[in-house]
Each structure stands twice: as C-alpha cells, then as structure tokens.
Amino acid sequence: MPNKRTIDLLVESFDLSVRRKYEIKNPNGDVVTTLYFPPITRADRKKAQARANTTDGLEISTQMLCQIAEKEDGSKHFAPADAINLQREIPEKILNEIELFMFDLSNDETLDEAKKD
C-alpha cells in the first residue's frame, strides 16, 4: 500500500463538521440565543478579510462572525450586512466574548493578540 500524501493525512485527521455551542445570555442570565461554530479554516479567514475590504482586525472578526455563526439546524445566524449593526448595537464586551469563543481563544487572550497569530 503506497504511503498517503501528507495533505490526505491532515484532512483525514480533522473533522470540520464538529461544531461548538455558545449561548448568549442577557444580564439576567437568560439565554437569548445559541450560536454554533464550525472550525475556522484559512479560507474562512481570507473570505472574511475580502468581505471586510480592510486589514482592520475588528472589521474582519465581525465579518467572520456573520459568515460562520450557525443556528442549530446549520443555517446562518447572520447576513454579511448584519456586521455593521452588530458593531453599532451590541456592547463591545459581548461582541468580544462571542468572537473570542468563535476563534477558540480563552478570555485571557485579547483579540489583538489573536490577530497577531
């Protein structure tokens, strides 16, 4: 049996269909909605950067949120045009918490630190 190519080994090793669940809660602790996030690929990052049409990390991360956040049934939670409303209407702290979860980062690491990686 011939050796598998490295790319084939890598693709077989990581399941992109596994999603992580994030519950958004209001100040009273009630769940407002639940977001599901698949693993982020480099292609996802490039697409979000192209949509944002900038190198600004905050713009890109909000576009990424709109692009990959899913409902339980797999449909999209947001349209690309929702990015501006998220930035204007949602408290920064809440948006940061969602985006840190989306990027699979701990709350100890800031978005700016994550964007340098």
Language model region names:
Residues 28-117:
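Short, surface-exposed, charged amphipathic helix/loop patches that serve as local interaction elements
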Residues 12-21, 63-64:
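A short, compositionally biased
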Residues 7-10, 20-22, 48-54:
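Short secondary-structure capping micro-motifs at structural edges
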Residues 1-15:
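Low-complexity intrinsically disordered segments
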Residues 18-30:
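Short acidic-hydrophobic surface loop/beta-edge motif
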